[in-house]
Amino acid sequence: MNTTEWHTTDERTADERTADERTADDYLERARQAGLVAEVRGHRYVADRYDDPFTDRRQILVEYCDPGLPADAAALGALRDQLREHHATAEAVLLRVTGGAALPAPWRPRLTYICHEPSAGTTPSHTRPAVSVRPATPDDDALVHDWLVQAFRNAYPGQEVDAHHSGIEAVVANPGRLSFIAQVAGVPIGHGTVLADERDEVTGEAFAELVDILIDDAEHRREATSALVDAAARATAGRRLCGHVVHPHEPGQARQADVVLQTLLSADWSVDHAFWESTW
């Protein structure tokens, strides 16, 4: 099915479709013009090559698929076969799945995007907090850079991540970056870094991405994390605040990532979408 045919079977006018639907239409039209739209068992998808910037691993990124594809086991298998046939040099496929749906083996989660939804009526604590949070200044750039390096190394265990990797430097230099410093008794113990002017390529939605929170002080980690999230939410009020959890391949670290995710989901976060990975 091509995109033009799909448009003509929808009898609603452009004004009657929701903003999200119109944005998806626009995205699919751009993808069609680029030759990236394909179909498997009646489900459309958009796929292109994507090399991991930190490992150079050759992958195929399925940035969009019709909502019914992830729930269709036969379509998932056919998708892998189809992509392998057309991209023989790739090692894996990454599939974007909206919401918290879980895919069957051999798929495994690689990156889960979550959005902050603060609970209404939260009772403030009357105890004096040990942790204070302040906006970072240029004098803090070296500290923030070091914490970001550690965060990327944590995301790629066993991989040599250069301290001056372009991906890290891009975060530091991003004009929309807002960093916050958590401190105890005036001593910095960690940071939270937000990119305030991001946009979802598929939905077109503007959002703020909480790129990293890293706390060196285990004793104050929970309090500092909460305070940094609050600071990021206040600074980006008016647009969704999203973060992510990386799921490493190593089983022990993967289990720990799942514990972190479930802890977040039991608090003020919900799954927006996830990237699931399958090797050939």
Regions flagged by a language model, labelled:
Residues 29-37, 41-43, 169-181, 209:
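A short helix-loop-beta-strand connector motif used in the catalytic cores of GNAT acetyltransferases and
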Residues 49-51, 159-184, 190-206, 213:
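A conserved beta-strand-loop-helix scaffold within acyl/acetyltransferase catalytic domains
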Residues 74-78, 219-231:
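Conserved acetyl-CoA pyrophosphate-binding loop and the N-cap/start of the following alpha-helix
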Residues 1-85:
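N-terminal charged segments
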Residues 50-63, 71, 198-210, 220, ...:
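A conserved beta-turn-beta hairpin within the catalytic core of GNAT-like acetyltransferases
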Residues 8, 65-129, 243, 248-280:
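Acyl-donor-binding surface of acyltransferase catalytic domains
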Residues 1-30, 127-162:
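Short amphipathic alpha-helix that is part of the acyltransferase structural core
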Residues 136, 213-215:
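Hydrophobic adenine-recognition pocket in adenosine-nucleotide-binding enzymes
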